[in-house]
């Protein structure tokens, strides 16, 4: 399919504040054929005009694993998963602090603490509210927390403790949500994001691509998330885990994944777009191209799935001449 939009011109119009990408133009990107590389070049131009060759590094700690009452079909920690994973309660505070120190030493500027479960207990919130100030006092790290459907009081406590950001992904389009999880709804996720906003905490929210969503659904989801004004957008590509309902699910191709990221770059030109889980698997020889499009990425492992050695990640970024500093986006 050839396309009608001049995407370099569109990028300039976006940069000048004159316009933003339309639904139709976003769909055109996903449907592009032989001229996809022209769109990629325009998306890269857009990224470089905003944040140059800077990339921020995130390290993820699985601080509580398994034992989850939700039934998310992609997740090895859900109650319906038979995946062989370690299961444990919230790690002791000294262990979390030690892992934060290691993250800082490895060049991370963001330390992500992830907890399984519907939401933390009162005791777990108290523990988090003790360790967060300790990390902030001793290390120049931003802290992002993933902890399920946090209520207003829990968010207020975390805000007082100094949390920088809360992650709560929308994951998949609303019409696809019942195919992925039934113990909660898409609305439950949107409501959680609203509560985070209301406590004046930065929102980190994104997607898991490759779970049966349509192109139209993915674009609608992106525009819905844009309305919620996230600080950062982690983009995951399904890591099909044996023992989960989506364990044999895989219809993504490297070029499709690259088009998705180019589209999201146009939808979120001034936000922190993060390349997350699945990059090592789905992009194959295109991983260099997609890494140049984003503002941040993860070092090392994910939750229950392995990533790359962190030093290998750093070497890869340096070969691309990306500056992994701790500077904020322009």
UniProtKB/Swiss-Prot annotation:
Catalyzed reaction equations: (4R,5S)-dethiobiotin + (sulfur carrier)-SH + 2 reduced [2Fe-2S]-[ferredoxin] + 2 S-adenosyl-L-methionine = (sulfur carrier)-H + biotin + 2 5'-deoxyadenosine + 2 L-methionine + 2 oxidized [2Fe-2S]-[ferredoxin]
Entry keyword set: 2Fe-2S, 4Fe-4S, Biotin biosynthesis, Iron, Iron-sulfur, Metal-binding, S-adenosyl-L-methionine, Transferase
Pfam families in UniProt: BATS, Radical_SAM
Gene3D superfamilies according to UniProt: Aldolase class I
BP-aspect Gene Ontology terms: biotin biosynthetic process
GO molecular function terms attached to this record: 2 iron, 2 sulfur cluster binding; 4 iron, 4 sulfur cluster binding; biotin synthase activity; iron ion binding
UniProt xrefs under InterPro entries: Aldolase_TIM (IPR013785), BATS_dom (IPR010722), Biotin_synth/BioAB (IPR002684), Biotin_synthase (IPR024177), Elp3/MiaA/NifB-like_rSAM (IPR006638), rSAM (IPR007197)
Pathways involved: Cofactor biosynthesis; biotin biosynthesis; biotin from 7,8-diaminononanoate: step 2/2
Location of the Radical SAM core domain: 53-276
Superkingdom, taxonomy of origin: Bacteria
Documented EC number(s): 2.8.1.6
Annotated residues for binding of [2Fe-2S] cluster: 112, 144, 204, 274
Positions that bind [4Fe-4S] cluster: 68, 72, 75
Note on cofactor: Binds 1 [4Fe-4S] cluster. The cluster is coordinated with 3 cysteines and an exchangeable S-adenosyl-L-methionine. Binds 1 [2Fe-2S] cluster. The cluster is coordinated with 3 cysteines and 1 arginine.
Cofactor (UniProt): [4Fe-4S] cluster; [2Fe-2S] cluster
Coiled-coil positions: none
Enzyme kind, highest EC tier: transferase
Family listed: Belongs to the radical SAM superfamily. Biotin synthase family.
Subunit structure: Homodimer.
Stated role: Catalyzes the conversion of dethiobiotin (DTB) to biotin by the insertion of a sulfur atom into dethiobiotin via a radical-based mechanism.
Protein name as catalogued: Biotin synthase
């Amino acid at each position: 399919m050839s396309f009608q939009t001049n995407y370099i011109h569109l990028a300039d119009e976006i940069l000048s504040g004159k316009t933003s990408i339309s639904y139709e133009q976003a769909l055109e990107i996903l449907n592009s054929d032989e001229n996809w590389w022209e769109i990629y070049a325009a998306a890269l131009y857009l990224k470089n005009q905003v944040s140059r060759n800077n990339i921020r590094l995130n390290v993820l700690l699985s601080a509580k694993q398994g034992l989850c009452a939700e039934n998310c079909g992609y997740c090895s920690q859900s109650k319906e998963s038979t995946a062989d994973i370690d299961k444990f309660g919230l790690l002791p505070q000294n262990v979390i602090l030690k892992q934060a120190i290691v993250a800082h030493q490895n060049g991370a500027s963001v330390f992500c603490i992830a907890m399984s479960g519907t939401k933390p207990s009162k005791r777990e919130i108290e523990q988090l509210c003790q360790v967060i100030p300790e990390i902030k006092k001793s290390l120049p790290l931003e802290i992002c927390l993933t902890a399920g459907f946090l209520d207003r009081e829990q968010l207020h406590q975390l805000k007082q403790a100094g949390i920088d950001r809360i992650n709560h992904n929308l994951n998949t389009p609303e019409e696809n949500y019942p195919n992925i999880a039934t113990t909660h709804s898409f609305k439950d996720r949107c409501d959680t994001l609203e509560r985070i906003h209301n406590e004046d905490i930065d929102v980190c929210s994104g997607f898991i691509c490759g779970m049966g969503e349509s192109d139209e659904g993915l674009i609608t989801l992106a525009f819905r998330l844009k309305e919620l004004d996230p600080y950062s957008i982690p983009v995951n590509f399904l890591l099909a885990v044996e023992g989960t309902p989506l364990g044999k699910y895989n219809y993504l191709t490297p070029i499709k994944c690259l088009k998705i990221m180019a589209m999201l770059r146009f939808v979120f030109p001034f936000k922190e777009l993060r390349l997350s889980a699945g990059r090592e698997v789905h992009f194959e020889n295109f991983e260099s191209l997609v890494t140049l499009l984003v503002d941040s990425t993860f070092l090392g492992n994910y939750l229950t799935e392995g990533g790359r050695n962190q030093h290998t990640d750093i070497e890869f970024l340096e070969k691309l001449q990306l500056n992994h500093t701790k500077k904020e986006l322009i």
